[in-house]
Regions:
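Ligand-binding pockets and gating/stacking loops
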Residues: 1-450
Length: 450
């Protein structure tokens, strides 16, 4: 008995195309925009390093050693490769490589909530129909599309390479699946691919894109032809046919399959990134952009990993900052060694920073810092970014910007423009209403010499 005779046609496609555990395969369905606002691209790929929960800028990239103790915290600053510029003592590898990065100390917006803040970071837009409570603001098809989804909508690919991959997991906390992680109102056909395995696990394997044993490309093409004949008997579903085509292209793309074989990296390289989820996620991100994936979102931890209301300094010192320091240093060095630094735009940011004043939550004994979107810091590098400088400034308490500020919308516009898509590009929602894909302004200052 043949495989096809024992399976429904779509089940057969799903299995043959490798929609296996560990990856969510998109299902194209929305209509693309007429005008992608095409322009010259600075980058071939973007890596968004998402510090979900909100990194304390005061204890990392914008320290205030002269401030009172309740502001400055417990850490000491150290010198960097940039004269007169200091960052946290627990970021020594980054400090030595600051000539690669532009450090922006005047990121700012007005949303102190995790869910709407992350939506802004991941989409470059405010949340449509934002509600009052977190339970009402979870992931939905009302969301604005994330960068990979909008790119897929505006610039559909035909080479078997996904427009975006999110790793190493989605942002989910109990009943809350954080918004901004998929195609939103553009429909599930444009959702980015989602890795749901820890690349640091010794059992990490993404067989999703591998041909089954004994199956070659010619046999896949034969199966595809058979499915097309079967589908031609009726009107069919155009969205499903597009999904079918995309699935077969992914299956035949050895570049995608090979990117997930992180076990093929030399031990020295893997060790250099750090044998933890942060490090191996950024190594996998490098492999994906090397394979041609245009947008990789690397979540550095679960949803509130950087949400240091309690034990701010212990959590940062003992794990978060050392892991991030090593991983970012290795990523920058590796991208450069592979000839990818100049064609990859790297963004490192959370949804906001932390409060200037140290506080202790009711019922807790170990202090921390609360949410603070009024000013915070981020790192930008690669793809023409002029590194080795600090852009923007906060006040003496790290509470407000005292120079021109940049919002997540501007980060989003810069991501789009770096890939050659104008932020004024038009997308249409489910009601066919036109909108700019991003209302922000590109951060041209990143690419300008002083």
């Amino acid at each position: 008995m043949t495989l096809l005779s024992t399976l429904a046609r779509r089940d057969f496609l799903t299995i043959t195309a490798g929609a296996a555990i560990g990856l969510a395969l998109p299902r194209p369905g929305a209509t693309r925009a007429a005008d992608a606002g095409e322009r010259g691209a600075r980058a071939k790929s973007v890596i968004l390093v998402n510090l979900s929960g909100g990194l304390s800028h005061l204890d990392s990239l914008d320290m205030k050693p002269e401030a009172p103790a309740e502001v400055r915290g417990e850490f000491k600053p150290i010198a960097t490769a940039l004269p007169g510029v200091q960052i946290c003592e627990h970021l020594p590898l980054l400090a030595a490589r600051m000539s690669r990065w532009a450090l922006v100390r005047s990121l700012s917006h007005g949303e102190n909530g995790h869910l709407p803040g992350q939506h802004r970071l991941l989409t470059g837009a405010t949340m449509p129909n934002q509600r009052q409570t977190d339970l009402d603001n979870v992931l939905s098809r009302r969301d604005w599309p994330c960068y990979a989804a909008a790119l897929n909508h505006l610039r559909p690919r035909r080479d078997g390479i996904p427009s975006g991959v999110t790793l190493p997991h989605a942002l989910i906390e109990g009943p809350l699946t954080w918004p901004g992680q998929h195609a939103g109102f553009l429909g599930p056909g444009h959702d980015p691919m989602l890795v749901t395995q820890d690349p640091n696990s010794p059992n990490f394997r993404m067989d999703t894109f591998a041909l089954p044993p004994g199956t070659d490309a010619e046999r896949v093409d034969q199966r595809r032809g058979l499915l097309e004949k079967l589908e031609s008997g009726g009107t069919g579903d155009p969205a499903f046919r597009e999904h079918q085509r995309h699935a077969f292209e992914l299956l035949r793309s050895g570049r995608v399959a090979g990117a997930f074989r992180i076990d093929q990296e030399p031990v020295k390289v893997r060790d250099g990134y750090g044998r933890n989820q942060f490090g191996q996620s950024l190594l996998l991100a490098r492999r994906l952009v090397q394979a041609g994936v245009p947008i990789v979102q690397a979540n550095m931890g679960i949803v509130q990993t950087w949400d240091t209301h309690v034990d701010n300094w212990g959590r940062l010192k003992n794990r978060l900052l050392p892991w991030l320091d090593r991983a970012l240093a290795a990523l920058a060095d590796d991208l450069d060694a592979q000839g990818l630094w100049d064609q990859t735009f790297v963004v490192v940011s959370g949804e906001f920073g932390r409060t200037p004043k140290v506080s202790t939550l009711p019922g807790e004994t170990i202090p921390g810092r609360d949410h603070w979107a009024s000013v915070y810091s981020g790192l930008f590098g690669g793809a023409g970014v002029v590194g080795g400088r600090v852009i923007g400034k906060s006040d003496r308490a790290g509470a407000r910007p005292v120079s021109p500020s940049y919002a997540p919308f501007d980060i989003g516009a810069t991501i789009y423009e770096s890939l050659g898509v104008g932020p004024e590009s038009e997308i249409r929602d489910a009601q066919n209403r036109p909108s700019r894909v991003c209302t922000g302004a590109p951060m041209d200052v990143l690419f300008q010499n002083r």
